[in-house]
From Swiss-Prot:
Annotated region (G5), positions in chain: 211-220
Signal peptide, first to last residue: none
Biased composition range(s): Basic residues: 7-22
Domain Bms1-type G: residue ranges: 72-237
Region (G2) location: 109-113
Acidic residues bias (residue ranges): 605-635, 644-654
Organism per entry: Schizosaccharomyces pombe (strain 972 / ATCC 24843)
Name of the protein: Ribosome biogenesis protein bms1
Lineage summary: Eukaryota, Fungi, Dikarya, Ascomycota, Taphrinomycotina
GO terms under cellular component: cytoplasm; mitotic spindle; nucleolus; nucleus
Protein's gene: bms1
């Protein structure tokens, strides 16, 4: 049976064209727009709301990213975690993934190439508090390792709370030790629990990776590959503090102090150098103020840029889809990488025993071929110094050259040699159409090749392998190493003319004026000639090109013209040319436009016409006379006519000037209307997009302002940019830093702004951390991490009292913010900080949370207005109606005079005022009140006393200690007493005592008998007068006889029996009630169970009946009731 063919739609032909025309629509969704209208208004509203929420979540405050695009600094990736979580193993695995290099020990930062434009610096964060604070300030990405088998530890939570006030960089969680879980269900539950706990601390959806067991000392390659991909594509938002300050992570340190000085004084201040990649903003080249956390503040002695030890792959400007193995570089000078290990006092270099192998399948380049040939050498270089120069393989070595004295006057070189060693490379690139001045600037200035007087040698076309290597950049340019048809190559044609053209064009290139001006080896004439290009011009005129192809290295004659004659000719030609330029009307019009009377439009036209003469740069080429002679003739011919036009233009009448002013007003009005109207294309642009475009435009302007400057001049003006590998020299560093240097602890060099070098009172908004076990007390020392510094100071806490004063607090509030004022270095307001009581690891052995408080800076000042309450009490000793005399409040009349007019009040609330002092010794004073007070009243005066902040500030210098984790500053008073075994002193006035108040005796109220008789009965005195004599019954005692005593005894016994029976009856009744309640509870429980069963049975039957009814109705039959 034949198979059926599939249907293939036609794509060409008449029928296909008709179908294409049918598909053409008028822009609507379909031919029937009503069919595709909104079906549900609620759904559309929800969709619109969701779209708006997504767009709003993407918005953030636009910030200027000052990181350069061409060579950004390496991304600092900090690996942090508690001890034993696998930090070193993770770094080894990642380094192995990026560079194929195995590290035995991690000491210091390690930089690797991660992509075409990205480099990564891995840093292992130690577990001490000082290192965690320093790493939190410079890390771009934090890999937070968590032991999944144990959970979150105290170091992890502390580090998260340190990151928050310092900018909160990117964080990625990594769970390790997953292989310790025996059951899959337990592992799944642990992952879910830790993931949600991690999201609680950061944000919903924070990335969390899972690493299983270790294989061969590394994590599995697939898991490391997934993690490295996320690291490579991670985007970073500029942080505020880092975007305003320069900083670097030192990857190398050297001591440059003279050994003689150290021998004379071992404690002398050291001169050190720190190396590293610059981050943040530009670092000034001279006298930059920096701070090294853990050491102190310094001023740099010298800052210089070095060659990048780990350059990015895109530096060669060659587009590649992936990195080659040679481009996967690694740089870690303080680790055993690359065979070089920097120790404290020596450098270890590992020399590998394997030689360079030339048995490679790939085609070798020029450098590799040279190394191969050096391996085959039988004798080292310099053994046979008289071997001479062998030009050809079948010729003899030439020892000397006989030169005719009549032809050459060998007087030595009188001018500086031109760097012409790259003529061949320039000619090849020019022939290929890829000539660039940057290639010339990158030439090696130490090349000893000199072609002065030997241009004829370049024109030789002899087939030689050595010459072929000299003129070729690579094997691709040669077209094969053993090619016998070199004479047919295009690049060999007209080499002499190309060389002469290259020499003539060398004078047109921009020269480094500063280098020529400050070169002491040049005389003023030579410097002027070098600036004007006279040396290149003279060398071009002195060279006699020989086109004789039969001669090889033919020595040509040198024209002996003096420099002074050339200088005079140049000056004459320059003066003639300048005089002609002053006659040019266009240049004169441009000059006039620089003044107020000049027209802006005329200046723009003049710039467009004259800009063609300045294509070579800011400096005029005065030697290209041939190219400019024709133009100058034309300018001189038209100068007379232009002069007449200018004279006529100067005689403008008043009417023409008014018309010109009216035209300018109209242009200005139209411009304002256009601005009010706005650009119709930008009507939909919101504020966020507009601000980002404004920032981008400003960055382009800033970048273009320095593009035309050489690197040295640019560094003098704006400093060294981020991404530059710099060398910083610092003097007078404490000798402990060098003696106790440990590369495991990070060394950060942070730049300081001018305002941050001053000290004063800093007011902050502070809150005790909710996990810290104790509240903070005023005048207890606290260690602050603010800016680059870590310092200890004494804060005073306060709170705003009715927005009129700052009232001092003895302790911080429990769950709210308060103000804190302390003496320390200034930082910009709104900068975050965190505070701890101690950075020593011994303080953490108690298992408590060490982050004491967090907050932000509010204000910086040199004074403060914190006050505390002062209550003065006194008692009256004389009272005259509303006037009273008070004592025991002041001790002298001077104090009374200071408080005259102050408000006072009594405990009962009667207000008064201080008047005058009445005693010259004891401080008594007269006061008036709004009502009469009693002698028993206490009078008090409420005042506010200013509090002075203690000016104490000391830097945390843990890097100067032998043990970096045990730095101790000022201790608390309780700690000192505990260590010394002293008891807390108890002041008598501060002790709590029982309040003993004397009982008051009131005199009896005497109401006159006449008044008492008029009172109603209820208002009369009820208290009777006590009897002075006892009554009749009180005087006599009742004695019982025997019969009465028997009756009373019997009644007492009967009552006792009755009481006992009543107690037994009540107890029996209570027991019966208890049994009854138990029985009723059982019956109630049984009733509830029975009701539950009945309900379940009823619902089951009812559901069955409903299902039956549904089935019967679905089958189309009517159910019977």
């Amino acid at each position: 049976m034949d198979e059926k063919k599939g249907h293939y739609a036609k794509h060409s032909g008449p029928k296909a064209e008709k179908k294409k025309l049918k598909k053409v629509s008028d822009g609507s969704a379909s031919n029937n727009p009503k069919a595709f209208a909104v079906a549900s208004a609620g759904r559309m509203a929800r969709q619109a709301m969701r779209t708006a929420d997504i767009s709003q979540k993407k918005l953030h405050v636009p910030m200027v990213d000052r990181t350069p695009d061409e060579a950004p600094p390496p991304v600092i990736v900090a690996v942090m975690g508690p001890p034993g979580t696998g930090k070193s193993t993770l770094i080894k695995s990642l380094v192995r993934r990026y560079s194929k290099y195995t590290i035995s020990q991690i000491t210091g930062p390690i930089t690797v190439v991660a992509g075409k434009k990205r480099r990564i610096t891995f840093l292992e964060c130690p577990n001490d508090l000082s290192s965690m604070i320093d790493v939190a300030k410079i890390a771009d990405l934090v890999l937070l390792l968590i032991d999944a088998n144990f959970g979150f530890e105290m170091e992890t939570m502390e580090f998260l709370n340190i990151l928050a006030p310092h900018g909160m960089p990117r964080i990625m969680g990594v769970l390790t030790h997953l292989d310790l879980f025996k059951k899959t269900s337990t592992l799944r539950e642990a992952k879910k629990r830790l993931k949600h706990r991690f999201w609680t601390e950061l944000y919903q959806g924070a990335k969390l990776f899972y690493l299983s067991g270790v294989l061969n000392g590394r994590y599995p390659d697939r898991e490391i590959l997934n993690l490295s991909r996320f690291i490579s594509v991670m985007k970073f938002r500029p942080l505020r503090w880092r975007n305003q300050h320069p900083y670097l992570l030192a990857d190398r340190m050297e001591d440059l102090t003279l050994p003689v000085d150290i021998e004379q004084n071992p404690k002398v201040g050291r001169k050190i150098t720190l190396y590293g990649y610059l981050h943040g903003t530009n670092l000034p080249k001279h006298d930059a103020s920096v701070h090294i956390p853990g050491v102190g503040d310094f001023v740099t002695s010298d800052v210089s840029s070095l060659e990048d030890p780990c350059p990015p792959p895109d530096a060669d400007k060659v587009r590649r889809r992936r990195l080659s193995e040679k481009q996967k570089l690694i740089y870690g000078p303080m680790a055993d990488i690359g065979g070089i290990l920097f120790d404290k006092d020596r450098v270890y270099i590992e020399v590998p025993t394997s030689n360079f192998s030339k048995d490679e399948n790939s085609e070798a380049g020029f450098g590799e071929r040279m190394v191969m040939q050096l391996q085959e050498a039988q004798q080292p270089l310099g053994v046979d110094g008289n071997s001479g120069l062998q030009l050809f393989s079948n010729s003899d070595a030439i020892d000397t050259v006989d030169r005719e004295s009549s032809e050459i006057d060998n007087v030595g070189r009188k001018t500086r040699r031109q760097p012409t060693g790259l003529i061949n490379q320039e000619l090849i690139k020019e022939d290929e159409g890829a000539f660039d001045d940057s290639d010339v600037n990158s030439a090696d200035e130490n090349e000893d090749v000199d072609f002065t007087g030997k241009i004829g040698a370049i024109n030789n076309e002899d087939e030689s392998d050595n010459e072929e290597v000299a003129f070729a950049d690579s094997d691709s340019d040669l077209g094969g190493q053993f090619d016998d048809e070199d004479s047919n190559l295009r690049w060999k044609e007209g080499l002499a003319s190309k060389a002469a053209l290259a020499y003539s064009q060398s004078g047109k290139r921009r020269r480094n004026i500063q280098k020529i001006f400050y070169d002491e080896s040049l005389s003023p004439k030579d410097a002027y000639a070098e600036y004007k290009g006279e040396s290149a011009k003279s060398s071009e005129s002195d060279l006699v090109v020989s086109d004789d192809e039969e001669d090889f290295f033919k020595v040509s004659k040198v024209a002996n013209e003096s420099i002074s004659s050339n200088h005079e000719k140049l000056m004459e030609s320059e003066s003639d040319r300048l005089s002609k330029k002053w006659e040019n009307p266009q240049l004169l019009a441009q000059l006039k436009s620089r003044f107020i009377t000049g027209s802006l439009l005329d200046s723009i036209e003049g710039q467009e016409e004259v800009s063609q003469d300045d294509e070579e740069g800011d400096f005029e080429d005065l030697e290209d006379e041939e190219n400019s002679s024709d133009n100058e003739m034309e300018e001189s011919s038209g100068s007379s006519v232009t002069a007449e036009n200018e004279e006529s233009a100067d005689e403008v009448d008043f009417q023409t000037e008014r018309e010109e002013n009216a035209r300018k007003k109209e242009e200005l009005r139209l411009r304002f209307e256009e601005e009010d109207r706005g650009d119709p294309e930008k009507k939909d642009v919101d504020w966020y997009t507009e601000e980002k475009e404004k920032i981008a435009r400003q960055l382009v302007i800033n970048r273009e302002a320095f593009e035309d400057m050489d690197p040295e001049s640019r560094a003098e003006i704006e400093g060294y940019r981020a991404g530059t590998y710099v060398r910083i020299v610092i003097n007078d560093v404490p000798f402990e830093f060098v003696e106790h240097f440990d590369s495991r602890y990070p060394v950060v060099v942070g730049g300081l702004l001018p305002n941050e070098q001053r000290y004063g009172l800093v007011q902050v908004r502070i809150k005790r951390h909710r996990w810290h076990k104790k509240i903070l007390k005023t005048n207890d020392p606290l260690i602050f991490s603010m800016g680059w510094r870590r310092f200890q100071s004494i804060p005073v806490y306060s709170i705003s009292d009715s927005r009129t004063r700052n009232r001092m607090l003895k302790y911080t509030p429990e769950h709210m913010h308060c103000f804190g004022t302390f003496y320390g270095p200034f930082v910009a307001p709104n900068s975050g900080f965190c505070a701890v009581q101690s950075v020593a690891n011994s303080f953490a052995k108690a298992g408590s949370f060490r982050i004491a408080a967090t907050g932000s800076v509010l204000n910086i000042d040199q004074s403060t207005d914190i006050v505390k309450k002062l209550k003065l009490t006194g008692v009256p000793y004389k009272i005259f109606k509303n006037t009273a005399f008070i004592k025991k409040m002041f001790s002298s009349p001077l104090e009374v005079a200071k408080f005259e007019g102050a408000n006072i009040r009594t405990v009962s609330g009667i207000r008064g005022q201080v008047k005058k002092a009445v005693d010259q010794e004891h401080g008594h004073f007269r006061a008036t009140f709004e009502d009469k007070i009693l002698m028993s009243d206490i009078v008090f005066l409420r005042a506010w006393y200013p509090v002075q902040v203690r000016k104490f500030c000391t830097m945390v210098t843990n890097l100067l200690e032998t043990d970096k984790t045990e730095w101790n500053g000022m201790r608390l008073t309780g700690e000192v007493r505990h260590e010394l075994g002293l008891k807390t002193p108890l002041r008598p006035n501060s002790q709590y005592q029982e309040i003993v108040r004397p009982s008051r005796h009131f005199n009896p109220l005497k109401v006159p008998a006449s008044l008492q008789a008029q009172l109603p009965f209820n208002s009369r005195q009820k208290a009777l007068r006590p009897r002075s004599k006892p009554t009749y019954m009180q005087k006599r005692t009742v004695l019982l006889n025997a019969e009465e005593r028997k009756v009373r005894d019997l009644l007492q016994k009967v009552m006792t029996l009755h009481t006992d029976k009543e107690a037994k009856r009540k107890a029996k009744k209570a027991a019966e009630h208890e049994r009854y309640h138990k029985r009723m509870q059982k019956e109630e429980q049984a009733y509830i169970e029975k009701k539950r069963e009945e309900k379940a049975e009823w619902f089951a039957q009812h559901g069955k009946r409903l299902r039956q009814d549904g089935n019967s109705s679905g089958s189309g039959k009517r159910s019977k009731n």
